[in-house]
Structure formats: C-alpha cells, structure tokens
C-alpha cells in the first residue's frame, strides 16, 4: 500500500483540476517477477485499476503510473486481485439491482403497435455504470390480458424497448419488464418484474 499526499503549505492537495500526477514507486520485493495491478478505492468503495508500466532504472525495477488525484494505492498480484475485484463487482451489481427502481411505459407507434420501454428511475447512469464493469445488460418483456396474473414472456433483448405487433385488435393488454445482468452467459443479478401502471389496447 502507498499513500500519496501533496501539500502546499499546510493544505493537502487531493484533486488536480484536470491535471495529472506522474508517480514512480519501487517494485515490492515479493512482487518482483510477477504480473501486477495498480489499484485504488473509489468513492463507492470499489477497487479500480490504473494503467501502469514497469521500468528498470539501474539494477532496480519501478512501477510508473499517472493519476488525476491522490489516494491510497496498492500494488497487488494480478491473479489474486482480479478474482477479488470480480467478486466485489458482482456483489455491487446485485446490491444495485435490489435497490434500483425502474419505470415501464407503453406508447402507440404510427402503425398502431405498442412500444414498451423500461428505464432506470433511480439513476440515469446506473445501466452504463454496470456495463462499464464489463457486464452485459438484457431486458425481458412480458404481457397479459389480466393486470395481476397470467404474464407470459414475449421477448428477451439487449435493447430497453420492444414493439409488440401481435394481439387481438381492440383488446387491452398489460405489460411488465425486468432487467437482467450477465457476466458472459452467467446470470449475475436481475430486477423484480415492474409493471406498467396502465394497459394498452391493440
């Protein structure tokens, strides 16, 4: 672990207002010859990886990286860190999905079909934040002729909207949707089924 602090007089500098600090640290003896990562903990308590390079100066090896802020940094074994970060991210995503609020809406298209759309209500950046961690986000859309029962899956899609073109003309249908998060083919988390508050006629 390395704590990096800069001071002007008695004032600590934490951010560089768009600038960067260039840092060179000695390679820890126990990590010499191993693949390493340089990480720090962000404001959400998540480990983030910083790009780095290893340089040889004289007979010694050093780690070089840039940072837009000072923090507590760690140089760690790559294999061990990747496993821990993967577990941490999965737990974070599950927590997000459990507390997230989604809104499902229906609108009529120009061809009189019904467009169903789901969006995160609690955070506009939540889906993009999840994707930035390397996960795949998919959406499932359900329909029923009854508001409280009988919902059947219509579509699983990577898009957050779905156009329902089939159904009996004049009949009212009710729609639900949910959000799923995958790590490759493995389901990591999913939201509860969220219902559109009103029905839509074909």
Identify the function of each model-found stretch:
Residues 1-44, 79-81:
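Proteolytic processing hotspots in large secreted/extracellular or virion-associated proteins
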Residues 40, 141-145:
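Conserved aromatic beta-strand anchor motif in extracellular beta-sandwich/beta-rich domains
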Residues 36, 137-141:
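Short beta-strand elements bearing conserved aromatic residues within extracellular beta-rich modules
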Residues 62-85:
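C-terminal beta-strand-rich structural cap/linker in extracellular carbohydrate-active enzymes
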Residues 89-132, 187-202:
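Pro/Thr/Ser/Gly-rich low-complexity, intrinsically disordered linker/stalk tracts
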Residues 164-184:
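Beta-strand-rich modules
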Residues 53-55, 153-159:
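Short beta-strand segments within Ig-like beta-sandwich modules, predominantly Fibronectin type-III
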Residues 34, 71, 171-175:
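Exposed beta-strand face motif in extracellular beta-rich ectodomains
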């Amino acid at each position: 672990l390395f704590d990096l602090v800069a001071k002007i007089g008695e004032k600590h500098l934490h951010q560089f207002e768009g600038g960067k600090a260039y840092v060179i640290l000695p390679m820890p003896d126990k990590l010499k010859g191993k693949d390493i990562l340089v990480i720090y903990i962000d404001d959400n308590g998540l480990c983030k990886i910083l790009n780095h390079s290893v340089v040889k100066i004289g007979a010694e090896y050093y780690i070089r990286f840039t940072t837009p802020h000072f923090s507590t940094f760690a140089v760690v074994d790559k294999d061990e860190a990747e496993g821990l970060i993967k577990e941490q991210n999965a737990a974070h995503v599950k927590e997000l999905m459990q507390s997230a609020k989604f809104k499902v809406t229906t609108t009529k298209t120009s061809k009189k079909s019904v467009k169903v759309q789901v969006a995160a209500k609690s955070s506009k950046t939540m889906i993009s934040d999840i994707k930035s961690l390397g996960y795949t986000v998919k959406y499932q859309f359900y329909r029923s002729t009854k508001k409280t029962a009988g919902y059947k899956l219509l579509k699983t899609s990577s898009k957050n909207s779905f156009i329902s073109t089939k159904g009996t003309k004049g009949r009212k249908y009710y729609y639900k949707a949910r959000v799923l998060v995958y790590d490759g083919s493995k389901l990591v988390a999913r939201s509860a089924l969220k219902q559109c508050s009103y029905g839509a006629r074909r």
